[in-house]
UniProtKB/Swiss-Prot annotation:
Protein name listed in UniProt: Basic blue protein
BP GO annotations: anther development; pollination
Top-level lineage group: Eukaryota
Tissue specificity comment: Expressed in the inflorescence and in the transmitting tract of the pistil. Detected in roots, stems, cauline leaves, cotyledons, hypocotyls, guard cells, pistils, sepals, stamen filaments and vascular bundles of roots but not of leaves. Not expressed in petals, anthers or pollen.
Nucleus in keyword set: no
Domain Phytocyanin: 34-129
Keywords on record: Copper, Disulfide bond, Electron transport, Extracellular matrix, Metal-binding, Secreted, Signal, Transport
Induction record: Down-regulated by microRNA 408 (miR408) via AGO1 and AGO2 in response to low copper availability.
CDD domains per UniProt: Plantacyanin
Gene3D superfamilies: Cupredoxins - blue copper proteins
Annotated Cu cation binding sites: H72, C112, H117, M122
Organism: Arabidopsis thaliana
Signal peptide: 1-33
Amino acid sequence: MAKGRGSASWSARAIVTLMAVSVLLLQADYVQAATYTVGDSGIWTFNAVGWPKGKHFRAGDVLVFNYNPRMHNVVKVDSGSYNNCKTPTGAKPYTSGKDRITLSKGQNFFICNFPNHCESDMKIAVTAV
């Protein structure tokens, strides 16, 4: 009989532990990636450089660039290319007009490399934590 009671006691503890873990999992806040449409008007265009101000980005968040592909594009670049408005060799422009780009941890730099567009502040720098 003692053996039976020990098994029941162990089973009861296992159930209580399982229930506690379940409650914790249900209450946990799961961090999900956020999606941001670039540009105050929802369009990737000139004078976008200030758009990221006041926003908090995380690695895995997605930036959506909406634009007319006959007039603009998006190129992910490094800080030097961003500051100089130069497209590095081998950089692949996004050209769909509805590009979705996932942020990596750290600094992320984007420009339009159509002539004189980056120089007209069609560029953004985003830091993702």
